[in-house]
From Swiss-Prot:
This is Putative pre-16S rRNA nuclease. NCBIfam families: RNAse_H_YqgF (TIGR00250). It comes from the Bacteria. It comes from Francisella tularensis subsp. novicida (strain U112). GO terms for cellular component: cytosol. Belongs to the YqgF nuclease family. Could be a nuclease involved in processing of the 5'-end of pre-16S rRNA. InterPro entries: RNaseH-like_sf, YqgF, YqgF/RNaseH-like_dom, YqgF/RNaseH-like_dom_sf. One of its GO terms (molecular function) is nuclease activity.
């Protein structure tokens, strides 16, 4: 049974993070972890995983609009393998198509004064997690 979940919106410069619960099917943005050419600040990610202690980690898989792999897809898959090995949790990949667009739309809907990349990336992780929870 799933307990708490963490979702990750993988990116080359930033990694958005959200947490959620299957019982309530809700997701909450946690924030972002800086990445350097796709390599995350593992110390910061370690702290988040330790604090939230998720049973499963959901990682957005960047595919194009026709569901074909892109240049960043392989990097995201490699990242997912590293996450699974590092944290010994079940890792699930889900198509993250339009998650950033949805995050921007949500921020505009609530009239967020500053649509920052940090907010967008963390909210995109929420969209990824909500999508995964609705399908599982």
């Amino acid at each position: 049974m799933f307990q708490s979940l963490i979702a990750i919106d993988y990116g080359k410069a930033r990694i958005g993070i959200a947490s959620g619960q299957m019982i309530t099917k809700t997701a909450t943005p946690i924030g972002t972890v800086e990445a350097y050419d796709g390599v995350p600040n593992w110390i910061e990610l370690d702290k988040i995983i330790k604090r939230w202690n998720p049973s499963d980690i959901i990682i957005g898989l960047p595919l194009d609009t026709q569901n074909f792999e892109t240049d960043i897809t392989k990097a995201a898959k490699d990242f997912a393998k590293e996450v699974q090995q590092r944290y010994q949790r079940k890792v699930h990949l889900i198509n993250e198509a339009y998650s950033t667009r949805e995050a921007r739309w949500r921020l505009e809907e609530v009239k967020s004064k500053k649509v920052s990349h940090i907010k967008v990336d963390a909210l995109a992780a929420c969209v990824i997690l909500e999508t995964w929870m609705s399908e599982n």
